[in-house]
Amino acid sequence: EGFKKRDYLYNYDNAIEKAQETKCIFLVEGQGDVWKLYEAGVKNAVGLFGKDISKKQRSLLLKSGVTKLIVLTDNDQAGRESKIKIKRDMSRLFKLVFPSMHTKDLGNMFIDKLKEEILDDLKGCF
């Protein structure tokens, strides 16, 4: 059977304390994106293991007690589709923030650019 990625959010157990403190979670597609945010000082990032959010992942987010999701999916077709689905499925449950990103993948950004272009506007969320 193997690992059921749809039942988990990558880094959830490590992110939950800071997420509950700030009432925010950074939602990204992959593990590399979580690592990049961690390098930049963000301790409350979780990864979807892809572009789609499952019912089980949504339940984990609801159970966390956060009120705001910072959605940073990739800047490609799949990432744009993911944003549309997240907006449709989650907008009644959370305040959603979709920071604009000028690169395809968060994991490829330099830390200083990530801080300047995205994180500077999100003080108090991490």
Where are these regions (language model features)?
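Phosphate-handling DNA/RNA-contact segment within nucleic-acid enzymes
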Residues: 1-64, 82-83
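Switch/connector loops and helix/strand junctions flanking conserved nucleotide-binding motifs
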Residues: 79-81, 104-107
